[in-house]
C-alpha cells in the first residue's frame, strides 16, 4: 500500500475582492501553513473614486451629496464633518434647535451603523438568526430618516449653519416610541448573543489589542475603547450639544473581539439615552442660521451661465473660504472621522484631506491575524468594522 504524501510547503490563497465576508471590495492575500495564518497582505483601492480631488472643484454645498458616499451606512457623520469645517472657518453659529436635531440624527445614524455591523458580523461567524432581526430595527430607523429628510440613505440633510428642513409634525412622538421599543430589542440581543457559548468560543481572546498598541497604531472609536482607553470625541471636543446630556463613555479593557462587540452593544443603549433626552428638551426657534445669508454673493446672472441658479429648494449660500487651515473631527461609529481643510479665499477648498477611521483601523489587521487560524480572520475583520467606500475614498 502506498503511503499518502503530505505537502509541507506553504499555501497562498486570495480572499476577496468578491468574498461576501470582506464587507466590500477588500482583497486579502493570505499565506497559510495548514490552517495557521503565516502572513496576510491587504490590497486596497478597488473602490477609489478620488473624493479628495473632487472636493477641490466643488463648493461645499455642491460637494455634500458626494460625502454621503464615503461611509454610506452612516452618512449623517460625513455630512456633519463637511459642514462643521466651513462653519468654524466662517465663525457661523448654529441655532440651538438645529444642533439638537443634528445630535438626534447623528445618534440614530450611529445605531443604524452598529446594527448593520452586528448582523453581518454574526453571519460571518455562523449565526444567521440575528442577521434578520437587526434589519427589522434598522428599517424603523430608516423610516424615521425618510420622514425627516426624504431619503432612507444618502440624506443630504445637513446645511452650513443648520439643517435643510425642520422635523415634520408627529416625528418626535414616533422617535420616542422607537426608543422605548429598541431598548427592549437590545436586551433581546444580549440574551440571544452575549451569553451564547458558541459565540463566546469564537470571539473571546481572539484579536487582542493592548492599550499601548492601540495608541501606537492610531486606532479610534470602539477599537480604542475596547482596549481600555476611555476616549470619545463627543466628550473631548464638546461639539454640537452633547455636554447638555447625561451619558457615559462605554469601554472595555480586554481588547479582544468580544470586548469590541460589548462596546458597540453598550453604545447603542447610550445613544438611545442621548436621543430621549434631546427629544424631551428640544427647544423652539429656527432650524438654520439666517445670518449666513449675508455671506451670499448675489450677482446679475444670465440664463445658463456659470453663476446661474435654478429657482428651486433654497440652498445654503456659497461663500469664500478664508485663507487658513483647519482640522475638524467627529466621533463616527467606526472611530475618528476628520477632515483637514485649507481655504484659499475661494468658494472651492484648496485642500480637503479626509481622515477615515476605517482606513486607519484596518492597518492592524495583518498583525492581528498572524499565528491565528484561517477561520479567525472573519472574526477579527468583522470586529474591526470597515466600509470600503470610506477606506478607499
Curated annotation (Swiss-Prot):
Its EC number is 7.1.1.-. It is a peripheral membrane protein. SUPFAM superfamilies: HydB/Nqo4-like (SSF56762). PROSITE patterns: COMPLEX1_49K. The keyword Transferase does not apply. It comes from the Eukaryota. Keywords: Chloroplast, Membrane, NAD, NADP, Plastid, Plastoquinone, Quinone, Thylakoid, Translocase, Transport. It is found in: Plastid, Chloroplast thylakoid membrane. GO terms for cellular component: chloroplast thylakoid membrane. GO terms for molecular function: NAD binding; oxidoreductase activity, acting on NAD(P)H, quinone or similar compound as acceptor; quinone binding. One of its GO terms (biological process) is photosynthesis, light reaction. It catalyses: a plastoquinone + NADH + (n+1) H(+)(in) = a plastoquinol + NAD(+) + n H(+)(out); a plastoquinone + NADPH + (n+1) H(+)(in) = a plastoquinol + NADP(+) + n H(+)(out). NDH shuttles electrons from NAD(P)H:plastoquinone, via FMN and iron-sulfur (Fe-S) centers, to quinones in the photosynthetic chain and possibly in a chloroplast respiratory chain. The immediate electron acceptor for the enzyme in this species is believed to be plastoquinone. Couples the redox reaction to proton translocation, and thus conserves the redox energy in a proton gradient. PANTHER family: NADH DEHYDROGENASE [UBIQUINONE] IRON-SULFUR PROTEIN 2, MITOCHONDRIAL, NADH-UBIQUINONE OXIDOREDUCTASE 49 KDA SUBUNIT. Belongs to the complex I 49 kDa subunit family. NCBIfam families: PRK06075.1, PRK07415.1. NDH is composed of at least 16 different subunits, 5 of which are encoded in the nucleus. This is NAD(P)H-quinone oxidoreductase subunit H, chloroplastic. It comes from Jasminum nudiflorum (Winter jasmine).
